């Protein structure tokens, strides 16, 4: 028998709309997909999020808008609905981003507009026969926009040319755009001094193919424990990713303002779950916040079928990104992305229980009862003695109808997993993969035993698991029809092979903030 560690989440039958995530952003109604245009307003200390939005239905379709939401802390959101719309109902405002044009390089602003709120959107305008890049600017800090009268600003006569990500590159004193020639598997890099006139600098090709590339990003990311940083290129794949359907890959390298050169030939996956796509970072983020971004928590294989009512799709929690050198196996250590979830000041623990030194024979458990929000976090550090081969489980359980979402660790294989096979929502869909998994080396060794860390968040119908301080992550949605969410949560270990060094469970809620 193999020693086995698992988390099980069971649910109480209530109302499907109650499965809406509490902290991860969802639209108040309608359809949502890619995050767009994230930026930080340093004047009002406010995070802005835009998103692909169909307010007229809960499936993708035209006319497609940018929706808009804001947050003081990246956890409590205010939704404003449609913000930028197409000129015709059959067209769409596709993905792009927003920059803060502090120095008015575009010439769109006069002195009455605070430099911290000179907001310019760069996006793909989609018609039946073309994809071109357009610009719009805001005179009120990002709530309404005026379209540039000389659009498009970039047209290469290709119907699969989309998703610009623009940022200011200080060393070369220019704006940089990365954009996908999607079905050529090519990321083009352009430069501009004014956001309206663009020159091609170079092309980046590489990585896992799939069907096409989308939603690229390029940003400088600090390396933990050093004063150094590296550039990271993000590329989304859909369909045909190695995990099935949609996923994100990334590359670590150098950028001189003209060309991105990866350090190695490896394409790294950003997340090992099925529901993490179109990741983008926030422009103008405060230095103390670091590199902050989020992704769409869905997969194009089944996104239009998710069994929610008035709304469809959520974002992930916001994540802080750093780089660190970590072992991929006992012989090789490489620089990799670390992802840590961000909890704003509005997130508080309605209940919290911590326990240490739990073994299977102790038959101890950590329990939180009568949950009112359906939102939990769990933080577990455990060691594994592979010489003891008794089955064991670490469980989070809630009663009544027997459906469950599980997360866990198999010490024999040395791999973590998320299992949503015991949920009935979309159960017959062949693409709603039951199980996803990730391999990581031990976080450390103590008393000659491997030690692992697993932190997780269950937020409505979304689970995000962060392994060994975020060296690997697993993000999955799950659908239990008629569920309110978790009624209570329990952690227990029943195997001599697994020793829980420490554990903490929190029932989370949001409090009002100023």
Curated annotation (Swiss-Prot):
Molecular function terms from GO: fructan beta-fructosidase activity; sucrose alpha-glucosidase activity
Keywords: Carbohydrate metabolism, Glycoprotein, Glycosidase, Hydrolase, Polysaccharide degradation, Secreted, Signal
Catalytic activity: Hydrolysis of terminal, non-reducing (2->1)- and (2->6)-linked beta-D-fructofuranose residues in fructans
The organism of origin for this protein: Meyerozyma guilliermondii (Yeast)
Top-rank EC class of the record's enzyme: hydrolase
Any single GO BP term: sucrose catabolic process
Keyword ATP-binding (UniProt): no
Key word Glycoprotein present: yes
GO CC annotation, single: extracellular region
Residues spanning the signal sequence: 1-18
CDD domains cross-referenced by the UniProt entry: GH32_Inu-like
Subcellular location: Secreted
Active site per UniProt: 34 (nucleophile), 214 (proton donor/acceptor)
Described function: Exo-inulinase involved in utilization of the plant storage polymer inulin, consisting of fructooligosaccharides with a degree of polymerization (DP) value from 2 to 60. Splits off terminal fructose units successively from the non-reducing end of the inulin molecule.
Residues that bind substrate: 33-34, 52, 60, 95, 162-163, 214, 300
Entry protein name: Extracellular exo-inulinase inuE
Coiled-coil ranges (or none): none
Family: Belongs to the glycosyl hydrolase 32 family.
The EC number(s) this enzyme carries: 3.2.1.80
